[in-house]
């Protein structure tokens, strides 16, 4: 089965490239655009230390050094992420972590992680499709599905990769993705991977979204709307019922990233769905991470069976990745 799936994915990729090439009006690609076969290749094209990104970092660091400003990044924190942290033996109030419920370092969580290592080891050593499936994976996914009141859920080894592979796989060049202007980088990377048309709307402005859909919906096959439960850099949240009504009226999919709202919003901490009293089926794609309130690592997608089954068998970021470590 695995070989067949790989062959199918490769064939689909080749077909997409052939279609793209057939539709392109560009001239044939030369070996190195702008240079003849005997011309010398500029050094910045094959040296990492001349890469524009690295040069930008050097300029920033040199400027900070001249101003006597130390590098605030990659500080070595000692111990568990909590309301305080230690750096270089000195205690500080910690505003930089997202262990929202204090579960990272909780005795019960530590004990469960140790028990999982004793029973299953530190790695499942395979993708879940092949031989990496363990009872703890399905227990976690079924628990997430119950919390959201939906059919099923799927977990990924990376929160960032969850958005990238889900959006990147489900949507394509004939589709449109509309997103709040403040959505996370992972959603933007997923949109870029998909090849879909991307349009942003002003932060939390459901009326602007409605206007865009009124003008643009008929020009695309599938349309995805991407929001966040809580916007981590601003601390605010969308009027989700308004967005649900809009997506229904325009026959679009709605995806909500609950990385920072799950465990924080709602009477019982069950997220923005509980806060507004919505049904799980009001949102097509519930996304979240396991590294914030849930004190682990990775991400998840929750929704109807057709969505989850689809991702399990065909989403590259799940199919070709190792299953989550049992202690996580």
Label the model's feature ranges.
Residues 5-122, 252:
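N-terminal "arm"/small-domain region of PLP-dependent enzymes with the aminotransferase-like
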Residues 166-185:
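Conserved PLP-anchoring active-site segment centered on the Schiff-base-forming lysine
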Residues 169, 186-195:
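Active-site-proximal loop->helix
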Residues 199, 203-256:
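Active-site phosphate-binding strand-loop segment of PLP-dependent enzymes
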Residues 250-253, 260, 265-328:
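Active-site C-terminal subdomain of aminotransferase-like
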């Amino acid at each position: 089965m695995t070989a067949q799936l790989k062959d199918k994915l490769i064939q689909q990729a080749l077909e997409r490239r052939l279609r793209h090439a057939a539709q392109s009006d560009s001239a044939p690609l030369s070996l190195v655009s702008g240079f003849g076969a005997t011309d010398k290749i500029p050094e910045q094209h094959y040296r990492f230390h001349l890469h524009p990104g690295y040069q930008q970092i050097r300029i920033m660091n040199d400027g900070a050094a001249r101003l006597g400003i130390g590098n605030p990044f990659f500080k070595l924190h000692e111990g568990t992420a909590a309301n305080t942290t230690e750096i270089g033996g000195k205690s500080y109030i910690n505003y930089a972590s997202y262990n929202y419920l204090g579960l990272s370092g909780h005795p019960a969580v530590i004990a469960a992680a140790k028990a999982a290592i004793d029973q299953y080891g530190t790695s499942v050593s395979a993708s879940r499709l092949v031989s990496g499936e363990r009872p703890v994976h399905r227990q976690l996914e079924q628990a997430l599905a119950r919390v959201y009141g939906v059919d099923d859920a799927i977990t990924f080894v990376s929160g960032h990769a969850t958005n990238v592979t889900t959006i990147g796989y489900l949507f394509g060049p004939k589709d449109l993705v509309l997103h709040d202007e403040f959505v996370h980088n992972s959603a933007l990377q997923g949109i870029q991977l998909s090849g879909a048309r991307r349009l942003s709307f002003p932060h939390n402005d459901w009326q602007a979204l409605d206007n865009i859909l009124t003008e643009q919906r008929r020009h695309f096959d599938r349309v995805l709307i991407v929001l966040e439960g809580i916007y981590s850099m601003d601390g605010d949240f969308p009027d989700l019922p308004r967005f649900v009504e809009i997506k229904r009226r325009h026959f679009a999919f709605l995806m909500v990233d609950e990385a920072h709202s799950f465990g924080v919003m709602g009477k019982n901490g069950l997220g923005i769905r509980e806060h507004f009293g919505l049904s799980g089926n009001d949102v097509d794609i519930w996304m979240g991470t396991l590294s914030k309130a849930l004190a682990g690592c990775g991400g998840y997608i929750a929704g109807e069976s057709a969505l989850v089954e689809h991702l399990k068998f065909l989403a590259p970021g799940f199919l070709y990745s190792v299953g989550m470590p049992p202690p996580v």
